């Protein structure tokens, strides 16, 4: 019934790939591309609290919608709201399977006071196996993880195991 403690994977990726060798191969082959994509996303200064960053908010939304469409989601679109754009996408072809809704936000908080930063907030980098940059932990990292997980499933299985609706807001 479960995995014994001495055989328990120490990392989520290890747990997933132990069950699916094709997924493990895909994740290994795309590791560098996934990291570069993540860093590219983090470079967008999508600060929602600053009206002068409205163009960056829009650019982040369009970047996400383009990624969703590229990896196989249908109806990937940016919808205007009175405040900030919402990105919506879906894939609804897992007949009989549940529908899962994934929500994240792609905006970040202002960086002021900038003089307290020891690194440039929108020039992300990897240090000691960790990605450092504004939004890496809240919430661009989680959002990007959802994109890459779906991409890996589309690439290795040609489909998702559930119906999936995506809602990302700025």
Feature roles, as predicted:
Residues 2-15:
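Short, Lys/Arg-enriched N-terminal segments with co-localized hydrophobic residues
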Residues 3-4, 30, 39, 130:
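General helical secondary-structure elements
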Residues 8-11, 54, 116, 142-144:
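N-terminal low-complexity, intrinsically disordered patches enriched in charged
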Residues 11-12, 38, 138, 152:
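General helical structural elements
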Residues 17-114:
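N-terminal helical capping/dimerization or prosegment-like subdomains
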Residues 81, 167-170:
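Short loop/turn motifs enriched for small/polar and acidic residues
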Residues 97-168:
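Active-site metal-coordination/substrate-binding segment of hydrolases
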């Amino acid at each position: 019934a479960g995995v014994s403690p001495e055989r328990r994977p120490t990392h989520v990726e290890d747990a997933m790939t132990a069950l699916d060798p094709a997924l493990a191969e895909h994740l290994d082959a795309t590791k560098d591309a996934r990291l570069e994509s993540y860093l590219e996303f983090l470079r967008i200064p999508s600060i929602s609290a600053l009206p002068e960053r409205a163009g960056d908010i829009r650019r982040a939304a369009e970047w996400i919608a383009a990624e969703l469409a590229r990896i196989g989601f249908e109806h990937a679109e940016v919808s205007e709201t009175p405040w900030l754009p919402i990105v919506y996408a879906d894939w609804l072809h897992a007949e009989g399977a549940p529908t899962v809704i994934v929500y994240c936000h792609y905006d970040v908080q202002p960086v002021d006071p900038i003089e307290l930063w020891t690194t440039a907030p929108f020039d992300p980098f990897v240090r000691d196996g960790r990605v450092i940059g504004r939004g890496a932990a809240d919430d661009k990292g989680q959002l990007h993880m959802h994109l890459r997980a779906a991409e890996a499933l589309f690439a290795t299985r040609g489909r998702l195991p559930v119906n999936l609706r995506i809602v990302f807001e700025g």
